[in-house]
From Swiss-Prot:
Keyword Iron-sulfur belongs to the record: no
Family that this chain belongs to: Belongs to the prokaryotic/mitochondrial release factor family.
Lineage: Bacteria, Pseudomonadati, Pseudomonadota, Gammaproteobacteria, Enterobacterales
Protein name: Peptide chain release factor 2
GO biological process: viral translational frameshifting
Classification via PANTHER family: CLASS I PEPTIDE CHAIN RELEASE FACTOR, PEPTIDE CHAIN RELEASE FACTOR 2
Processing and modification events after translation: Methylated by PrmC. Methylation increases the termination efficiency of RF2.
SMART domains for this protein: PCRF
Native species: Buchnera aphidicola subsp. Baizongia pistaciae (strain Bp)
Role description: Peptide chain release factor 2 directs the termination of translation in response to the peptide chain termination codons UGA and UAA.
Keywords: Cytoplasm, Methylation, Protein biosynthesis
Top-rank taxon, per record: Bacteria
Gene coding for it: prfB
Modified residues (N5-methylglutamine): 253
């Protein structure tokens, strides 16, 4: 490296160290070798006789390329910077210093973006997801709180450039919502949203009480991945109870006059899904079946982990013990009860500024 500038040498050493850590965490060498194997497989005529296999291989290839290409580029950029500095002598360093510092910033930015990707190592983190919001104890207050959470998550998803669709929304009798389901489409949507599953508690002076007494409300959030076609879930139609009804808006106003909304109950498990966002009953049924498939698969995975969860002392409980975050508006404080992270900028968080909480949860392996 450059002999006469310790500061530059230290920064390069730090960059190399960060890259090596990322390589280990993201299994760079394994992914790189697997990519070579896939390219060899795709050259075999026999492989192309099986369209389903080609689809599966190409999907895996695209996931590998994303990581391997980024790390390789950062590696090359750092090496190029080292080569440039080694060619320069101390008299010429000032003439290229601005360019060197500019390249440092670009490389550090690329590493930071890749570090975010390294938070998503779960099997389904790369998938899109559904977000269910359900008002809990607290009556009108809880229903208003559920609508605030819906708004918060919609804005956060938009800030991440995800495509969103509110596929079900049941309005409260006075204000707010009783329940809602959001479809969030985009790479790593489930990875970003999954740690939001749990009970969210709101404490505030009630706007619905003449004396503005302090009130505590609860709403639950449940996040589950939208499964791709490669994951099979067998659903027997005889196990389903399908109801159709008219979709209604706030205050009982009908969105349309036909019975296009669909509710499906899976009788063996009691799982209920519903969709009312489209005027087509057929499309709503297809969407509801996608939700049911995702929920059944999630339940299957959870059952496999059940024995391990029983042994854990920190098993989640219903009510107060199930909380993941507390939003205390009159004290201007939002606190994550799992990580201890706090924010006093309440409006920013409720407007979708969740990165502080979510990134900390992901880095803590939640």
């Amino acid at each position: 490296m450059f002999k006469n500038n310790n500061i530059i040498n230290d920064r390069i050493t730090n960059l190399v160290s960060q890259i090596n850590k990322l390589k280990r965490r993201l299994d760079y060498d394994i992914k790189k070798n697997r990519l070579l194997e896939i390219n060899m497989e795709l050259k075999l005529p026999e492989t192309w006789k099986h369209p389903s296999l080609i689809k599966k291989i190409n999907k895996e290839k695209n996931q590998l390329i994303s990581v391997v290409t980024q790390i390789t580029k950062i590696d090359n950029d750092v090496q190029e910077l080292i080569d440039i500095l080694n060619l320069e002598n101390s008299n010429n360093i000032n003439s290229i210093l601005d360019n060197v510092l500019y390249e440092f910033k670009n490389i550090e930015k690329s590493i930071h973006e890749l570090e975010k990707c390294s938070m998503f190592l779960g099997k389904y983190d790369y998938l899109s997801c559904y977000v269910d919001i359900q008002s809990g104890s607290g009556g009108v207050e809880a229903q208003d709180w559920a609508s605030m959470l819906l708004r918060m998550y919609v804005r956060w998803a938009e800030s991440k450039k995800f495509k969103i669709d509110i596929i079900e929304q049941t309005y409260g009798e006075v204000v707010g919502i009783k329940s809602a389901t959001i479809e969030v489409l985009g790479k790593y949507a489930f990875g970003w949203f999954r740690t939001e599953t749990g009970i969210h508690r709101l404490v505030r002076k009630s706007p619905f009480n003449a004396h503005h007494r302090r009130h505590t409300s609860f709403s639950s959030v449940y996040v589950y991945p939208i499964l791709d076609d490669a994951i099979n879930v067998d659903i027997n139609t005889r196990d389903l109870k399908i109801d159709v009804y008219r979709a209604s808006g706030a205050g009982g106003q009908h969105v349309n006059k036909t019975e296009s909304a669909v509710r499906i109950r899976h009788l063996p498990t009691g799982i209920v899904v519903q969709c009312q966002n489209d005027r087509s009953q057929h499309k709503n049924k297809d969407q509801a079946m996608k939700q049911l498939k995702a929920k059944l698969y999630e339940q299957l995975i959870n059952e496999k982990k059940c024995q391990q969860k029983i042994l854990e002392n920190n098993k989640l409980n219903i009510g107060w013990g199930h909380q993941i975050r507390s939003y205390t508006l009159d004290n201007s404080r939002i606190k994550d009860l799992r990580t201890g992270v706090e924010s006093k900028n309440i409006q920013s968080v409720l407007d979708g500024g969740l990165d502080l909480f979510v990134e900390c949860s992901l880095r803590n392996g939640l």
